[in-house]
Amino acid sequence: MQLITTENKLAGSKKALEIIEKGITSGEVNTLGLATGSTPETLYAELVKSDVDTKNVTTTNLDEYVGLAADDPNSYHYYMNDLLFSKKAFKESFLPNGEATDAEAECARYEGILSEHPIDIQVLGIGTNGHIGFNEPGTSFDSLTHKVVLTDSTREANKRFFEREEDVPTHAYSMGIKSIMNAKKIILLAFGENKAQAIKETIKGPVDVNCPASVLQNHPDVTVILDNEAASLL
C-alpha cells in the first residue's frame, strides 16, 4: 500500500490523474472503475481538462441508487453524465440499473459486465464509517455485486444531495468487496477531517468487516491519496 499525502483536494486529485493518465497512455488501462460522491468531483474536472485520449477506455461504476431513473438528477447516471461523460468521450460506460426490479438478475448482469471488462484501475472514495462503494460495515469480503440496505449514517451523509431527507433512497446496487478487490490497481481518495478516523482504521487497524476499506491492506497494488486533514490521525 502506497500512501501519498498532499496539501489539499486539488493536489490529491491531480496526483490521482497522473496515475490514471500514465496507465491510459501506456495502454495498460482499458477499463477504468469510477466512483461518485463529492470526493472524485475534482478528479473528474481535471480529467475533462486534460489532453489524455479516453476514446478507447471503457468505464464501470461502483453503484447506483435503487429506484432512481438514469435521468433523475440524484442518480449516479446523471452525476456521471453531468461531470464527465458529456464532456469526455469514452468507448463504453456501464453503471448498475437503478430501475431494475429483479435484484438478482441485475446483480448477475453487472457481474457479467465486470467479467467481460476486468478493471485495470478502480477509483474509490471512503465513507466516514469505512464503507467502499455502498458496502457497509459487516459486508462479507467475498461479496459480489448485490443490493444493499443503506445505513442511517450513509443516508445522513448523502442527504445534502437531495431536497428532502425522505427522498434519500434506502437501497442501492453496489459492486461487492470481492468485485472491487478484483481490480488490478486501486486508488483510494480521501479528503477532509471527517475522513481521518476511517483512514486511520483502514491503514492502521486490523483487517475487519466492521471497516470494509481495511480489506485494501490485502490488495497487492493500492495507492492511498490524502490531504493533510484526512491524514491527520496517521
Swiss-Prot record:
It comes from the Bacteria. One of its GO terms (biological process) is N-acetylneuraminate catabolic process. CDD domains: GlcN6P_deaminase. Its EC number is 3.5.99.6. Keywords: Carbohydrate metabolism, Hydrolase. GO terms for cellular component: cytoplasm. The keyword Hydrolase applies. The active site is at D63 (proton acceptor), N129 (for ring-opening step), H131 (proton acceptor), E136 (for ring-opening step). The keyword Hydrolase applies. GO terms for molecular function: glucosamine-6-phosphate deaminase activity; identical protein binding. Pathway: Amino-sugar metabolism; N-acetylneuraminate degradation; D-fructose 6-phosphate from N-acetylneuraminate: step 5/5. It catalyses: alpha-D-glucosamine 6-phosphate + H2O = beta-D-fructose 6-phosphate + NH4(+). Signal peptide: none annotated. InterPro entries: Glc/Gal-6P_isomerase (IPR006148), Glucosamine6P_isomerase (IPR004547), Glucosamine6P_isomerase_CS (IPR018321), NagB/RpiA_transferase-like (IPR037171). Catalyzes the reversible isomerization-deamination of glucosamine 6-phosphate (GlcN6P) to form fructose 6-phosphate (Fru6P) and ammonium ion. NCBIfam families: nagB (TIGR00502). Belongs to the glucosamine/galactosamine-6-phosphate isomerase family. NagB subfamily. PANTHER family: GLUCOSAMINE-6-PHOSPHATE ISOMERASE. This is Glucosamine-6-phosphate deaminase. It comes from Listeria innocua serovar 6a (strain ATCC BAA-680 / CLIP 11262). The gene is nagB.
